[in-house]
A protein has these predicted regions:
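Extracytoplasmic
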Residues: 641-843
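The substrate-binding groove and active-site-proximal loops of carbohydrate-active enzymes
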Residues: 127-130, 191-208, 225-234, 272-287, ...
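Bacterial Sec-dependent N-terminal signal peptides
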Residues: 1-28
């Protein structure tokens, strides 16, 4: 964000603005004094050209409501060009075009730009001008945000603080163009929560235009511009013809999911399988071509992105007979239909081909794709980028996209109930993607939309300007976002709590949590429970300190997910205690059984409050997801069930020291580190950075930027292990001189497809031992169940090596790690001198 051509009058108010939540260079709205009072006489007139885009009208009317929320002033849309506020799009607003012609505003800032706005004061009029319709819309919503209206005012009930006066300061304000061209969300896995809420709210069995209008407004307020609509049981295009019209009018680019080609929803086929015939292009080409043609005919004249290609029926893999030749024929035929229906070259209609699961194999095997088609890469459903385009592939004219998940249905187990994505993970992986040329389209699977408020905002903000966020500023984003929702005075504490709940929840999803997740023996279970209890207490303390108007928003965004996961951890901890004590014949097992049952009931009480009491029952049905009782990957069980219980009848350079034969070293507690040497024409190599909150324990250490070489880099740790204690711990076995070293790192995939990534481990200056940690971390049949699923679900790779530990006089040793590839994130090192006995602590 920047202010250009600042006038003297604006400088006079800089001292005032610097005390506000955003820097003086970022803000143009004030509530105490400024150059232009926009709500004088309690009336605000907003002018827009009647010939301007329909989406600008939607946003202008939203601004009318926002001004009323903030100040109580009466705002109206007027035909008076001397109105207090002028909004318009170049080429669609005569007033804006005239100001450019008169050089009252700099047209060069907008002409030829994409989705860019400028906000400036001309004489005594606030002017919001856009390079195109969405540029104008974003400018309008920028004013709303600076007035204090959160994009989440509706979807998270964030209150709007009252101000009697709204001032703006002279200058020209803009936030440039978006880095990623298409930025959107995918409503997915929407049953039972979103579907129940929609039925309770609108009385429909599907999402109609009333529902989608609210979603579209949120997307635009967040500076998104596209959507994949919900598609499990809904058909966006067929259920309500107003859906498509509303999207196009408001300025949202519609598309369909990775397995719904040619602007058709899967349900349009599924509801009439008998009529359409098998979803098999080899056997049913004519009918499927007709199905595809109808989709293109229906979307003609609207701004959409056409998904091309095919997957199997219902998001399954295609038949074994499918091959690259067949897929090539399908895409060629689809493009012929697009050209025929639109009367334009196929290349003039935006298209995307999703390289999802087995479809990526077709591309990797050399399938040729038209140069104008955007190639959509996908994460592994757990937030790990599978691959990035190489230097040659980045020349692809259609560009590259990314399909990213914070919600997932599938093996090893669903992840639907809560946001379990640590704040730092999307930032790190989206940075990886963007730095490797993935910048045409980003789409985020958000499940039911709620409770994914923060990851949606984070994703959209990064898509607009990923270079704004680095290792030093990612936590600042969380803080500023919390200031927007809960006020400046609450931002630091709210951000700390939000960071921690996302971090904690990322350790294990509620669906995968059970009595065996952590160890009772080494105290890990108790430690995790204590962390949640402390966090819950901190959140409740802040909740109670807030004005009542903020309670519902705070509960939705922060308190509810903490209460849910704290309670679930306590419940499974109680079950683990019950089961262990029962085996010992200890009657205290009954006490823990009672506690587990109490906590199971409390789970439903927490959800009931969310559904029926919070926000006056506004969110009835939104928290009805089953999450206790999983036996396999899916929630194919009738209702939540209490865990199995048993009862007994009534008849500093730091030197890390060992503890009980084990040394635990957090990655940031290094003795020394060496950055990478410059490679080729580089002025400097990659540097070690600490990623706060990254991983399962304290933080992560890695080399950045990822695009620079890592040769010559190393990081060294010191530890002290008493040889006698070690020998005693191992009972003088044959392995008494050996220790097991666990190097715990983030579960990064082999995104360069080079046969695995490696690092070296050296003890006391010995020759490094080379460790290839992810050569088999893939979905090949021989790896998927035993290696891939367990690893990505826990988000770490724990590689163990055995080394001979030489005797030293003081017991102090060094351990040096030398990464040989970028994007290796070290989280923790554990040296186990107990002869392989016992489980080491990961957290």
């Amino acid at each position: 964000m920047r202010l250009n051509n600042i006038k003297k009058a604006f400088l006079a108010s800089a001292a005032l603005l610097s005390a506000m939540s955003m820097s003086a260079a970022e803000r143009f709205v004030s509530f105490k004094q400024g150059d232009l009072l926009i709500n004088g006489n309690d009336k605000v007139e907003i002018y827009m050209d009647a010939n301007d885009c329909r989406g600008v009208s939607y946003a202008a009317n939203a601004l009318v409501r926002d001004i009323s929320k903030v100040s109580g002033s009466q705002a109206t849309i007027t035909s008076n060009q001397k109105a207090t506020i002028l909004v318009g799009t170049i080429g669609h607003s005569a007033a804006i075009d005239q100001l450019i012609k008169q050089k009252r505003i700099n047209g060069n800032l907008l002409k030829g730009k994409r989705e860019k706005f400028i906000i400036t004061v001309v004489d005594n009029q606030l002017v919001i001008a856009g390079s195109d319709r969405r540029g104008t819309i974003y400018g309008i919503y920028e004013l709303s945000q600076q007035m204090g209206v959160s994009p989440w005012y509706d979807w998270a009930d964030v209150p709007v603080e009252h101000h009697d006066s709204i001032f703006v300061n002279r200058g020209t304000y803009s936030d440039g163009e978006p880095a990623v061209r298409y930025r959107g969300i995918f409503l997915n896995d929407e049953a039972p929560c979103l579907t129940s809420w929609v039925k309770n709210t609108y009385g429909t069995e599907y999402g109609d235009h009333r529902f989608y209008q609210r979603v579209f407004e949120l997307v635009l307020r967040l500076r998104g511009n596209m959507m994949w609509p919900a598609m499990w049981g809904w058909a966006f295009y067929a259920d309500d013809a107003e859906n498509e019209k509303t999207a196009d009018e408001m300025g949202v680019v519609m598309s369909t999911s990775h397995h719904e080609p040619m602007a058709r929803n899967h349900q349009e086929y599924a509801r009439n399988r008998k009529g359409w015939g098998p979803w098999n292009y080899q056997k049913n080409k004519a009918n499927l071509q007709k199905f595809f043609r109808e989709g293109i005919e229906r979307m003609k004249g609207t701004e959409q992105i056409v998904t091309i290609g095919m997957r199997g029926d219902g998001d399954e893999a295609m038949s074994e007979e499918a091959d690259t030749r067949l897929m090539t024929n399908i895409i060629n035929d689809q493009r012929k239909i697009i050209a025929d229906v639109t009367g334009k070259k196929a290349s003039e209609t935006p298209q995307v081909w999703a390289l999802y699961k087995e479809v990526q194999d077709y591309y990797d095997k050399g399938m040729k794709v038209p140069d104008d088609v955007t190639l959509l890469l996908c994460d592994d459903n757990w937030g790990n980028v599978r691959r990035v385009p190489n230097a040659q592939e980045r020349k692809h004219k259609g560009g590259w996209g990314l399909y990213y998940h914070v919600d997932y249905v599938g093996a090893p187990r669903n992840s639907k109930m809560l946001n379990v994505t640590p704040v730092q993970n999307p930032w790190e992986q989206l940075t990886l993607a963007y730095e490797n040329g993935i910048d045409r389209l980003w789409i985020l699977n958000v499940g039911d939309l709620k409770p994914m408020e923060y990851p949606i905002s984070q994703f959209m903000d990064m898509a607009w300007n990923p270079r704004k966020y680095d290792v030093n500023s990612i936590t600042r984003h969380t803080r500023d976002w919390c200031a927007q929702q809960f006020g400046e005075s609450q931002a630091d504490e709210a951000a700390r709590i939000l960071n921690l709940v996302c971090k904690y929840n990322g350790r294990c999803t509620p669906e995968m949590l059970d009595k065996n997740t952590y160890s009772l023996e080494n105290g890990e279970w108790q430690e995790v429970v204590n962390q949640y209890l402390q966090l819950e207490a901190d959140a409740l303390r802040q909740y109670n300190s807030l004005p009542a108007a903020y309670h519902d928003a705070y509960r939705q965004i922060i308190l509810f997910p903490i209460e849910m996961m704290s309670n679930l951890h306590q419940m499974y901890f109680a079950q683990a205690q019950n089961n262990a004590l029962y085996k010992q014949g200890n009657p205290k097992a009954n006490v823990w059984a009672d506690e587990c049952e109490r906590l199971f009931k409390r789970d439903s009480i927490i959800c009931d409050y969310y559904n029926h009491k919070m926000s006056g029952g506004k969110w009835n049905g939104m928290m009805t997801q089953k999450h206790i009782g999983y036996k396999s990957w899916n929630d194919a069980f009738e209702k939540d069930t209490c865990p199995e219980l048993f009862r007994i009848s009534a008849s500093e350079t730091p030197v890390i020291a060992e503890h009980n034969g084990v040394v635990e070293i957090e990655a940031p507690f290094f003795a020394s580190k060496t950055d990478a040497a410059p490679q080729g024409k580089e002025k400097e190599g990659a540097k070690w950075v600490q990623i706060p909150f990254m991983g399962k324990s304290l933080a992560g250490m890695t080399l950045m930027p990822y695009t620079k070489g890592v040769k010559g880099a190393s990081i060294t740790y010191q530890f002290k292990m008493n040889a006698l204690a070690r020998n005693a711990a191992s009972s003088n076995n044959a392995d008494s001189k050996k220790v097991r070293i666990h190097v715990i790192i983030k579960s990064t995939l082999d995104y360069q497809n080079k046969g695995g990534m490696t690092y070296g481990v050296s003890v006391d200056g010995a020759e490094p031992i080379l460790v290839n940690f992810n050569h088999n971390l893939n979905e090949k049949p021989e790896n998927i169940y035993d290696i891939y699923y367990p690893t990505v679900a826990t988000r770490i790779i724990d590689k163990v090596i055995e080394v001979e530990l030489p005797a030293t006089g003081d017991g102090i040793h060094t351990l040096t790690l030398t990464p040989n590839d970028p994007a290796i994130i070290f989280e923790k090192i554990v040296i186990d001198g107990r002869g392989g006995k016992g489980r080491v602590k990961i957290i």
